[in-house]
Amino acid sequence: MQVILLDKIGNLGGLGDQVNVKAGYARNFLIPQGKVVMATKANVEMFETRRAELEANVAKQLAAAEARAESVNALEVTIASKSGDEGKLFGSIGNRDIADAATAAGVAIAKSEVRLPEGALRTTGSFEVSIQLHSEVFATLKLEVVAAE
């Protein structure tokens, strides 16, 4: 199914690209979220008239994400959790815990923006957590996990 991208989408392309995707992916995910429109003649003309507006929206979102990235990079968060003698935690620190701690420290982060490629944190210590604020913008959060008293 031919569609026109209204936003940058990973592994597909950028704003204005005409790409071929599976019909189910377009109908069930991309079109309901407003990320694409069908590539009909009328939609192509409509897109060309709205191109400047859409590009301005994308640039505005990117600038907002870069501003948030600067505040996240400057942030240092400490999480206290119960742990054993050797520094192993009773439980783990996951995406939600990190997002809640960062939000409590003053920078709003959604749990879906936190990237833990090696899974949840299970030991005490210092960690650098990757935060994906936009498809092109990543920030690094300094996280200290300490033993609770």
Swiss-Prot record:
One of its GO terms (molecular function) is rRNA binding. The keyword Protein transport does not apply. One of its GO terms (cellular component) is ribonucleoprotein complex. GO terms for biological process: translation. Pfam families: Ribosomal_L9_C, Ribosomal_L9_N. InterPro entries: Ribosomal_bL9, Ribosomal_bL9/RNase_H1_N, Ribosomal_bL9_bac/chp, Ribosomal_bL9_C, Ribosomal_bL9_C_sf, Ribosomal_bL9_N, Ribosomal_bL9_N_sf. Keywords: Ribonucleoprotein, Ribosomal protein, RNA-binding, rRNA-binding. Signal peptide: none annotated. Disulfide bonds: none annotated. SUPFAM superfamilies: L9 N-domain-like, Ribosomal protein L9 C-domain. The keyword Repeat does not apply. Belongs to the bacterial ribosomal protein bL9 family. PANTHER family: 50S RIBOSOMAL PROTEIN L9. NCBIfam families: L9. Binds to the 23S rRNA. HAMAP family: Ribosomal_bL9. This is Large ribosomal subunit protein bL9. It comes from Aliivibrio salmonicida (strain LFI1238) (Vibrio salmonicida (strain LFI1238)).
